[in-house]
Swiss-Prot record:
Any GO BP annotation: defense response to virus
Protein name from the UniProt record: Pycsar effector protein SaPycTM
Predominant place of localization: membrane
Record keywords: Antiviral defense, Cell membrane, Membrane, Nucleotide-binding, Transmembrane, Transmembrane helix
Ranges that cross the membrane: 20-40, 53-73, 136-156
Taxonomic classification: Bacteria, Bacillati, Bacillota, Bacilli, Bacillales
UniProt topology in membrane: Multi-pass membrane protein
Localization: Cell membrane
Listed GO CC annotations: plasma membrane
UniProt entry tagged with the keyword Metal-binding: no
Amino acid sequence: MKKDEYIKLHQSYLNEYIKFADAKALAIISINGFILNFNFSKRNIKFHNTEDIFNFTAFILLIITIILAAFAVYPRTNNRSEKGIIFWDNINSMGEKEFIEKVKFEKEEELLEKTIQQNYFLAKTASMKYSIIRKVFIISALGYSCLLFSSIFQIICS
């Protein structure tokens, strides 16, 4: 495999991995939002019993997961330079003609290097997103467990 083919393949892999992370985060936002709406829209938590404590804990945990998942989906470019030819935010800081000229006059080796650099930033982005999503899954599981315990106490006490 040629070096440029590998770099393009790696970039495609990273882009798909990031899309999948975003899809997971959006699914968690939807599922936990539905659970919150379904369980807590008509419930009045008064802390009179163990069931209410578990419900309140589940509510807080699921809110935290929605906030974290939204943070994972939040778009970022990772590159702080003002002008560049790779990241959309950097490209946007140039005029159309300036961008076209900059790409035209870049040497092939420099373009390859910039693409490799982008792959590095994409890998860091994917790593950060999946780190957050792992935490979201764990916190969601704790929230679901609290809801389960709440239901068990509701059955026992009724």
